[in-house]
Amino acid sequence: MLQRRFISSSGIKRLLHRESNKVMHTVFFKVRYYSTELIKKKHKEDIEDWVKAQLKDSSTISGVYESRNKLDWMDSITKSPSSLDILKNQYNIVKDKDFGILWKQKFESADPDILMTIISLSTNQKVLFSIQQLLILINSLHFLKRDYDIGQIYTTYEQFTPLLASHTDKGTYGQFIEIMLVVQHNLHHFDVCETLFAEYIKYCKVKPQMISLGLNSFIRSNNTQLAVEFYTQAITNPDTFPITEKQLFEFLRCMERYLDMSSMKHIFYLWLKVKCGDEQSSSTNLPSFKTLAIIHRMLLRFSNTDELNDFLTNPVVLSTGYTSSVQFELIEFCHSLYCIKGDRTKSIDDSILMERVDKFITRLNNNISTRKELYMSVVQAYVSTNNFENLKVILEKIQRDNDISIDGSFHLCISRYFVNTNQFEGLFKYYRSVVKTTDGKTRLRPAFIQQLWSCAVNVYPMLAKEITNDLLVTLKRSQYSKCLTWVYTFLQENAHIHTRKINGGEDSSLSGFNAVDFERFEEFKKKVSHNDVYGAELVISNSLKEGIAPQFSFLYSVLALCLRNSLTGLARVVDVILRTRFRYIPLKVDILWLKWEIISNYRSFEKLSAEHLKELEFKLKEFERVHQKELSVQNYLQLTQICFHTRDFKYACYLISQARKNLDTSNNKQWMMYYMTSLKLASRMHESERFSRILKDWNCNHRASLITPGCIRQIKGFMKYFEKRPAYISTAASIDNKEIKDRIDELVLRYVDYKYQGLENMRKLTLFLKEWFDEEISLLKLEQNERKMKLFEENKKEEE
């Protein structure tokens, strides 16, 4: 079960109502005396002799420690006075006089070797620097954007912080906590951020931007409910927590990523009530058009007419003028494009679309950011419908707009076309020839790697584990994680392989879950495998009550697993959750239920009556008739598989012919699914000639190059239908089994070639990413050198 971290709501309340006159107590230590006469020697020798002098001195640090209320992370020390006494007796703190002689200059210049020296002194020599001394180095490192090194300092000194804080003034300690909070957020150490944020709001004058940082940390560490709870209590304490409209926008934008509409409505309407409910409220508290657009977009997406009307007629919303703005019209227009994605009965009328785009461009002449949003929405619409020709048309229009450049966000959207159509080589070429060759304008970002990674795994599923391991070995290097602080977390969150049984073997791919849902699904599978129904129910229940709201892919996978394991009651609950949370429910959900109904009915009777069998066949045909315009290739093939249970092979032939008509001939995966289902149908019909003809067609089709070990295994299994049941096969329709085996052998050779191609592309991808990472590191070092010069100049001015 996922555990809540940080502090309770009562803990929040105590922090919210802190004492304004609270001061940090100062404690005086008796520090051992040591000589500095050796400073005439080399600096390294100075330090060594100084440390030796410390070790020879038998006196101990002593002083008075006035205990203060601490949070959980300090409890291990402060709950037991003897623990702090032990630290006092074991560790020496550098005297300011000697720090100025031996260390200050190196701290100010952020000497490259100083970090290892600090770690070594604390670990091996029991020597510590004060927080005030450390801040000199930390500020220099932060200016140079060496957050990884600051993180190392925090890790080394975390256990000593209560000791050092006890003789540090409140202002200095607050500076230390604030910069550490920012750095840990940059490092994506969100659990640590929770702890530091608790200290920050206790000892610092809270800044608005730090509230955003804290809220984001809660959400990213799966403490969504705590984030909402903190926001709810903090918004009513403006003197302590100066939340501005910008924080509202950033909080909602963060929540939008997880489609948590319930929390978003609470956040938004609470703002209107507290910040805009009074006639004397400041106009700066009115929600901006950007904020209103988020709520508007989400309400349209969840298709709740009553709630949408309530939002649009709200007095505060009306007072902003949003409903009569071009931004309002743009959201409505973009939503109409979004709806096309989920409805095959609709298509984009290119002439009307471009006409409306041109009108928006004219009206948005002075609003560059909103104009960019318009272009992005149209690009997304064409990508979602795999319309590459018209995608090029809109890109040409963007290129003619002097105020808009095709940057990384556009590249991510455009390259999604290649991911959707499983064209790894096209995607690789696009990144190599377009994205990376922009003279450093398009910098490396995690989403670029994720696209290349997931596309490679989708196109070469038999190499999913090899590709993932190769990327991990290549990118999980210390020189990368030190400079690109997001690398380690990114790899950990995305290196989840999801394996499922398909086509007689295993089909592996990247899970598609976020890190939280992946953990939930693994726990759910474990409960189901142990027949722990109550535990499985608890996983679903907790996913709704705790942390980030569950996403569609997680709930769909849970539903499928429930039906496969006959957990019908729980499956119905999950189905209700799905249909409540998401506006667009793909047909594959209804097909899951149709398959379950037909199979469960079929298994309920040893021998179905002709009447009952016809009833099941009618349900299947009626489903196809009602949803004919919406059915995708995959849907038709799923319905064909259901026909095998009713033994309605004639109707199965019709369904598979419909799948062929709708098949995207450039999509490798669709070809594989089509051929495998066709071969299964031929074997069930005991038509060896048809079986051989399909194999021949597959071998001749160079666009259908995706073949997996599972395909080969299952095709060989199909052969048993002809070998064991010759009585069912008519002489006229039968052919020599040797011919079929020869064609299977040919398919095996094609598989070997395809796997070799995948290994070669895997090698190219790894080299490409390594090269891109190295170039990014070089750019970062150049930028760091420029900042070093500025830092040197600043230090020189201070000395003068």
Curated annotation (Swiss-Prot):
* GO biological process entries: mitochondrial cytochrome c oxidase assembly; positive regulation of mitochondrial translation
According to the UniProt record, one GO cellular component term is: mitochondrial matrix
For this chain, the annotated S-S bridges are none
MF annotations from Gene Ontology: translation regulator activity
What species is given as this protein's source?
Saccharomyces cerevisiae (strain ATCC 204508 / S288c) (Baker's yeast)
Q: What else is known?
A: Present with 538 molecules/cell in log phase SD medium.
Family the entry assigns: To yeast YHR160C.
Q: Which protein are we looking at?
A: Protein PET111, mitochondrial
Q: Which UniProt keywords apply?
A: Activator, Mitochondrion, Transit peptide, Translation regulation
Q: Where does the protein end up? A: Mitochondrion matrix
What does the function comment of this entry state?
Required for translation of the mitochondrial gene for cytochrome c oxidase subunit II (COX2).
